[in-house]
Amino acid sequence: MTRREVREVTFMMLFQLEFRQDISIEDTLAQYYTIDIESTDEEENLPKVKLSESDRNYIQTIVDGVIKNKSELDGIISLYAKGWTLERIIKVDLSVLRYCIYEMKYMSEETPLAVSINEAVEISKKYGTEKSKSFVNGVLSSYYKALKGAN
């Protein structure tokens, strides 16, 4: 799988976990282990992907990190989503923002910040509303400037 496809699966897992706190991360990840991202299973409506061990480790790291640092990530989102409360942000955008901010904050050695932002914007275009792209890009660009200013 490409890194973009892995990011997309990561987003889908986080989005699913937003609504299903009753299932474990491991069970959620297991649902994604066997199929192809271009096809969907009508019954479960989940993309089916073939994940390598490296892909699973990457996804597990991001998902665990987002869950463990959710309060901190939400604080960052609240700071840079001017005029928006977390409750008003659609769940697609919120999941994308949490995922990307985690990657920017904790994994910038592995992924350049601009790449993280671009990938997040592409995912928001695909799964969000027509305004998602601009909203996600605005929040992440503001956070990017703050990170660059701190260095």
At which residue positions do the language-model features occur?
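N-terminal interaction/assembly modules
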Residues: 1-133, 137-151
